[in-house]
Amino acid sequence: MDVEVKKKNSLKGVISVPGDKSISHRAVMIGSIAEGLTEVENFLVAKDTLSTVECMRKLGVDIKLERNRVKVYGKGLYLSKSSEVLDVGNSGTTIRLLMGILAGQEFETILTGDDSIKRRPMGRVIVPLTLMGAKIEAREGNFAPVKIRGGKLRGIEYKMPIASAQVKSSIMLASLYAEGRTVIEEPALSRNHTELMLQTFGARIEIDGKKIFCYPGSKLKGQKIIVPGDISSAAYFIVAANLLPNSEVVIKDVNVNPTRTGIIDVLKGMGGNVELINERYVNNEKIADIVVKSSKLKGIEIGGDLIPKLIDEIPVIAVAAVFAEGTTVIKNAEELKVKESNRIKSMTSELGKMGAKIFETEDGMIIEGTGFLRGAEVESYNDHRVAMSLWIAGLLAEGRTIIKKAECVDVSYPDFYKTFDML
């Protein structure tokens, strides 16, 4: 499906964005290995999270889904062998976190996914899980499909070579089945939803800076989880409202966990008008309403420990940088190369077609703020974050923009285009 987007004069209104994707995945997975009923409200109903639901069902978990409410009837730590290959679709979170759970199961499972998943690196998960005692085979180069036989695991001390919430989470989930303590050390803080949710369910997880101490032996108990709005989905509205004149948008009930708010930190650093109100905590997660108004942005340098806090938002930050005064440099973001597409290449190529002065580097991009884009026919590369970022570019461009394969937004935000029509 192709979509057409035309220049918009301003954005005004109050909206909600769908439930957080990371938290929705984790609520279903951890609820499945807990004892008793877990009820999840405001669950994100999208292709990625439904892949998690289907995989857990194939492992014997009874899950009832009604609109955005989910009931998970947990089986405890030990699941049932699937008679089928588990297909995670496009979901990197599903395959990597599920490998952690399957490392503790005394049966063999094969995991696969779509073409995008088969290009994404699995070695970063295979290495620590193998050290813990799981037996894992993968396609040459450590790519999916992956065959995993779990069993008796041992605790390890593991220094992660890259900051990755998915890798960290996989090890933490495996640690529930291990004999002895597991210690994980990150090079920089990545999103910490797994730590917070495991603590909510009753696991003994201790955090000391960039170190996480995981102790086995706790029984997980079913919980009621209220999923806050996803800041990664809110990011598109935050950027658009900053850039379009005479705009004011309020986004209700958004997750503002400090490991996820890099987009707000960066926009404020660029001079953006973003304010958090009505701050509170639900299920250990910080939530707020976000108020965004039009502003004039200036270019900055983005890198270092900030990158894991905004890795998914860099494509839309690139759009903001086109309309900022001066030059924006994004560095230390090599991880973008192994997302659903190579997002460095995708964004430099497609914004370039629209007239942006944007240049690819080894670990990021350099954007000169020209304040101008022209409409063009652009490719999404079947990458939801690229498609949504190009939609924002189209709202700001002169003339019309056509986005190819725009239905890929269904992975994380099926009503994305409709929500913009409300403003």
UniProtKB/Swiss-Prot annotation:
Subcellular location: Cytoplasm
Active-site residue list: 312
Residues noted as binding phosphoenolpyruvate in the record, renumbered to the chain: 21, 92, 120, 166, 343, 385
InterPro entries xrefs: Enolpyruvate_Tfrase_dom, Enolpyruvate_Tfrase_sf, EPSP_synthase, EPSP_synthase_CS, RNA3'P_cycl/enolpyr_Trfase_a/b
MF terms in GO: 3-phosphoshikimate 1-carboxyvinyltransferase activity
UniProt xrefs under CDD domains: EPSP_synthase
Catalytic activity: 3-phosphoshikimate + phosphoenolpyruvate = 5-O-(1-carboxyvinyl)-3-phosphoshikimate + phosphate
GO biological process: amino acid biosynthetic process; aromatic amino acid family biosynthetic process; chorismate biosynthetic process
Binding site for 3-phosphoshikimate: 21-22, 26, 164, 166, 312, 339
Pfam families: EPSP_synthase
EC number: 2.5.1.19
Domain of life: Bacteria
Alphabetic keyword roster: Amino-acid biosynthesis, Aromatic amino acid biosynthesis, Cytoplasm, Transferase
An example Gene Ontology CC term for this record: cytoplasm
Pathway connected to this protein: Metabolic intermediate biosynthesis; chorismate biosynthesis; chorismate from D-erythrose 4-phosphate and phosphoenolpyruvate: step 6/7
Chief localisation class: cytoplasm
Chain's role: Catalyzes the transfer of the enolpyruvyl moiety of phosphoenolpyruvate (PEP) to the 5-hydroxyl of shikimate-3-phosphate (S3P) to produce enolpyruvyl shikimate-3-phosphate and inorganic phosphate.
HAMAP family named among the record's database cross-references: EPSP_synth
Subunit annotation: Monomer.
Record's protein name: 3-phosphoshikimate 1-carboxyvinyltransferase
Organism in which the protein naturally occurs: Caldanaerobacter subterraneus subsp. tengcongensis (strain DSM 15242 / JCM 11007 / NBRC 100824 / MB4)
Gene name in the database record: aroA
